[in-house]
Amino acid sequence: MIQAGLRIDVDTFRGTRDGVPRLLDLLDEAGLKATFFFSVGPDNMGRHLWRLARPAFLWKMLRSRAASLYGWDILLAGTAWPGKPIGRELGPLMRRTQAAGHEVGLHAWDHHAWQTHAGVWSAQQLGEQIRRGSDCLADILGQPVRCSAAAGWRADGRVVEAKQPFGFRYNSDCRGRGAFRPRLADGSPGIPQVPVNLPTFDEVVGPGLPREAYNDFILERFAAGRDNVYTIHAEVEGLLLAPAFRELLRRAERRGIRFRPLGELLPDDPRSLPLAELVRGRLAGREGWLGVRQP
């Protein structure tokens, strides 16, 4: 049996409203549980369009055929009109996810703002964004938030420090191999991190890998004897690619791949996890910096 964590990022209003119910049905059909990370504040994701001026981001959008993949309502959200408040209007879907037995955590208050500004915000601004998101999601769920995942994997040592006071059991803020405890500025171990170590759809699909070949590509990358942490998006696998994701789940079962929530990948005693650094790095297929484990 190959153990794998399944992380579902929910970035937008439409992804929550339309993608999450579909994914809940698919996971129920497969008898699986996963971790859902919700964005709960305003949906301003359309404001990323200014990044088209950057060649790497423009190429990513063209390579993944973003307009057909996401839809124009997602690509324009929060541009000509105020972003819709996701948690306030769609909180019942977050409670439904929790009631179905899935792990639920915080992705962001404002996904666009975090992905754009996390690298330059002050410690106070970082903490305020985390607090707003955590308080909102806790009010929706009726219980404290126990885990989080930085939007766009935009995390570094400052983000690690900012999350320390919130009592999360773990965070999934970076890319890399194996769960670890990040080293804080004073040398002590921080809240455990569960990194993602498999590529996402939008990072690899393009001229060299057509959509139809993606399932073959990704399934070959799950391996026994290690943590496999895989991320999908409600805006992709919950919408246009839902049939392909359903087939991926079926094929994964035949290969002995068993998906579970990320929290179940942690040892009973987190003190057994190794210490490592969480630093800024680069990853093929992504525009800009992101958090990576080192070493």
Swiss-Prot record:
Q: In which pathway does it act?
A: Glycolipid biosynthesis; 4-amino-4-deoxy-alpha-L-arabinose undecaprenyl phosphate biosynthesis; 4-amino-4-deoxy-alpha-L-arabinose undecaprenyl phosphate from UDP-4-deoxy-4-formamido-beta-L-arabinose and undecaprenyl phosphate: step 2/2; Bacterial outer membrane biogenesis; lipopolysaccharide biosynthesis
Keyword check for Lipid metabolism = yes
The chemistry this enzyme catalyses reads: 4-deoxy-4-formamido-alpha-L-arabinopyranosyl di-trans,octa-cis-undecaprenyl phosphate + H2O = 4-amino-4-deoxy-alpha-L-arabinopyranosyl di-trans,octa-cis-undecaprenyl phosphate + formate
Its GO CC terms are: membrane
Arranged from A to Z, the UniProt key words for this protein are: Antibiotic resistance, Hydrolase, Lipid A biosynthesis, Lipid biosynthesis, Lipid metabolism, Lipopolysaccharide biosynthesis
**What EC number is given for this enzyme?**
3.5.1.n3
Taking every annotated instance into account, which residue ranges of this chain make up the domain NodB homology? Answer: 2-260
Please name the top-level EC class of this enzyme: hydrolase
GO annotations under biological process? 4-amino-4-deoxy-alpha-L-arabinopyranosyl undecaprenyl phosphate biosynthetic process; lipid A biosynthetic process; lipopolysaccharide biosynthetic process; response to antibiotic
- Family per similarity comment: Belongs to the polysaccharide deacetylase family. ArnD deformylase subfamily.
Per its database record, what is this protein's job? Catalyzes the deformylation of 4-deoxy-4-formamido-L-arabinose-phosphoundecaprenol to 4-amino-4-deoxy-L-arabinose-phosphoundecaprenol. The modified arabinose is attached to lipid A and is required for resistance to polymyxin and cationic antimicrobial peptides.
Name of the protein in its database record: Probable 4-deoxy-4-formamido-L-arabinose-phosphoundecaprenol deformylase ArnD
